[in-house]
Amino acid sequence: MKLTSFCLFLFLAFSINSFSQSTASPNVTTFELEAPQLDTIKKIWVYLPESYKTSENKYPVIYMHDAQNLFDRETSYVGEWKVDESLDSIGKPEAIIVGIEHGGAKRIDELTPFPHEKYGGGKADDYLEFIVQNLKPYIDSNYRSLPDYSNTGIFGSSLGGLVSFYAAFKYPETFGMIGSYSPSFWFNRDIYKLPKNEKLNPETKFYFLVGTKESEEMVPDLREMIEVLKKNGLSSENFKAKYVEGGEHNEALWSDNFLVTYFWLLKK
């Protein structure tokens, strides 16, 4: 797949809403929070575990990108991840899921650490600063969260997979669990310098997933990155890479594998 058509797919898939009925669980609520770093107001989706209402338990928190596609078919373009239905069905382990809506036309800017010579972007530092300095303190103050590094994750797909990977190096004492699906490492190859130039917390857990029928760069790019990580000290115990035969770049791939990743990241 050529990069031009690939980027067009990304833009359309995350910028157009469908008109189907809402499928969001009753355990999902939303609120808005100012994001001064991005000069906008962000809509935030929060999934609370079933036991939240009847206990005083505290829970791990996973921050996820592209909230429009996580919980509700009505707000997604080509299908949802069904995060809420999946977690409602399993019981334990339980976690709070915080979804951050993407910025529409600004999505590329927000989710890319380095600019592309053609597609621009490169403002992920501002986006992550909003999560760490504004959103996370709000969540930790208003919900019964476990705020420490080992109980805080960040998770996304495509450009969301890229920025989740980047967050592990930008905030190595904040995010202990990284879910990186179909990461867009092709966007700027400076991302491969990151493990060499930035210190990684050795306890950080990474779960990577790609499909063999995504863009032609996806599988070799991930394999290259894993070799870079290994050379720079990442323990084999702290990462998992799954290559899905026939998997395509879409919500079906990511939804089908979400629970497996969730279990692995939360396993103590």
Give the role of each language-model region.
Residues 21-268:
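Non-catalytic cap/lid and distal C-terminal segments of serine-dependent acyl enzymes
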Residues 1-25:
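Bacterial Sec-dependent N-terminal signal peptides
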